[in-house]
A protein has these predicted regions:
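Conserved GTPase G-domain substructure that encodes guanine base recognition and part of the catalytic core
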Residues: 1-472
């Protein structure tokens, strides 16, 4: 019990997670599960990369202390050390917090997770309703910088909202049980030789081996963005990477979504023919690649041959880890295949454009809420006509133009009297007051512009709608 039941209806607000109390300024060990969400939020708001380490103070340390104090040899006692701390999977925690937070907290969580180089939710599952939601609004706050090859010589860079960036999406999914750790392999694939980072939670991380209860069906996304250094860049072009948690046989909607939005889908498998029937029924807009472990007991070369024939796959679409291949070689081979898939594909998509695919498949989009749409409509009414910024300000904000500039100059002169010369001071000030009065009359002669009318209407709307408007 994470103590979040009260927030299923009344969501966690931004003001709540920004509250300061004694626990905020101290770093005490976790003693119960109800402390975990707030501990995670505190660490995440500080952009602490250890935020996902949410292990409780367990009995394991006590048992080890007791064992170290005794002089007797008792190997069975060492084997039976309980592991009570690793009972909550970080993915369950993240899923629970996103489900229990309002849109503005979700946006802040996604931004801070991205800053920590964590993957962020793309499709959020809800085990109560058995539906998933495209987290478009939550990702809108993420802005990324990168340097494509075209700008490497000039040392320039591109900066844009990640939801608007049209990038090739490469998805990784699992069919049936698999001895290969898909997420750990992905982390190695995205890390260069000089620096390893756990972008995705995996089995060998702290608490990563705890059973998932509510996060199966979660599709996470991260982005690989080049820095322009050929010696460090893994991919020369920016690419989005999606990772679906759980067996695609149980989450066909999420799998269909990824098949229709991705440039390539890599399917990790080891099971027999029965599981592959799902692949035959998909409407593919992406290349399919099969990734398997030859050393697995359930691997069958004959089954793979039949499936590859049915899907019209060639050797380039199949990556196998054999007994002569270690993890480093396997990751290198997989990385080369991903790189080729990115280079040979022109199928690019933005997260914004994924919304239309989501609607076709019955996937919810959190931006479809009435308050968000109203706030977005009001914001678009103000920004839609902006082409030439200076001309726009002159037409729509005339009180901030030349008249305002002249007024400020007159007010400064009224107090400083730098240009009074030999004139009578009182007469000079009176003249300045007359000039100010004339300028005020000019200001008052302007009718309220349409943009200001829209702004006043939007800022006077209901609280949630106004917040969406200001955040747009």
């Amino acid at each position: 019990d994470l103590g979040l039941k009260d927030y299923m209806a009344k969501k966690i607000s931004l003001s709540k997670i920004l509250e300061l109390d004694e626990k905020t300024i101290t770093d005490q060990p976790l003693n119960c599960k109800s402390e975990i969400p707030w501990y995670f939020l505190k660490k995440l708001m500080m952009v602490n990369v250890t935020a996902r380490n949410v292990k409780l103070a367990s009995d394991c340390d006590l048992v080890k202390d007791n064992a170290s104090r005794t002089t007797k040899l008792d190997l069975m006692n060492l084997l039976n050390i309980p592991n009570t701390g690793a009972s909550l999977n970080p993915l369950d925690l993240i899923t629970a917090l996103f489900l229990c937070s309002d849109g503005f907290v979700q946006q802040e969580l996604a931004l801070k997770m991205s800053m920590c180089q964590y993957s962020v939710p793309l499709l959020l599952p809800n085990s109560d309703t058995e539906q998933c939601t495209l987290m478009l609004w939550a990702l809108r706050g993420i802005v990324k910088k990168y340097r494509p090859p075209a700008l490497s010589e000039s040392k320039g860079f591109m900066e844009e909202r990640i939801v608007s960036s049209e990038l090739p999406l490469i998805s990784f999914v699992r069919l049936g049980e698999c001895s290969l750790s898909k997420s750990e392999i992905l982390n190695k694939l995205l890390s260069n030789s000089q620096q390893y980072h756990d972008t995705f939670v995996h089995h060998n991380m702290e608490c990563g081996d705890s059973p998932r209860r509510i996060s199966n069906g979660l599709a996470e996304i991260t982005w690989y963005l080049p820095c322009g250094n050929k010696n460090m860049d893994i991919f020369s072009e920016p690419v989005a990477i999606a990772n679906l948690r759980g067996d695609i046989a149980s989450f066909e909607t999420q799998f269909s979504f990824l098949c229709q939005t991705s440039a390539a889908v890599f399917v990790f498998f080891e099971s027999g023919l029965s599981g592959f029937k799902l692949l035959n029924h998909q409407n593919y807009k992406s290349q399919i690649f099969l990734v398997g472990n030859v050393q697995s007991r359930t691997f069958s070369l004959n089954d793979l041959q039949e499936v590859a024939s049915q899907l019209c796959l060639t050797n380039t679409n199949i990556i196998l880890k054999n007994k002569n291949m270690n993890d480093a070689d396997f990751v290198k081979c997989l990385r080369k295949t991903v790189s080729d898939a990115v280079d040979n594909q022109h199928n690019k998509i933005s997260v914004e454009k994924m919304a239309s695919v989501a609607h076709e498949l019955g996937v919810l989009v959190e931006e479809d809420s009435a308050e968000c749409q109203a706030g977005k409509k009001n914001a678009d009414a103000i920004t839609a006509d902006i082409e030439n910024i200076l001309q726009y300000k002159k037409d729509q904000l005339p009180l901030r133009g030349q008249i305002w500039s002249e007024l400020t100059c007159l007010e400064k002169e009224e107090f400083r009297l730098q240009k009074v010369g030999s004139q009578n001071i009182e007469h000079y000030r009176s003249n300045l007051q007359e000039q100010k009065s004339e300028l005020r009359k000019k200001q008052n002669s302007h009718a309220m512009s349409s943009v200001m009318t829209c702004f006043i209407s939007a800022i006077s709307s209901q609280c949630i709608e106004r917040s969406y408007f200001l955040n747009k």
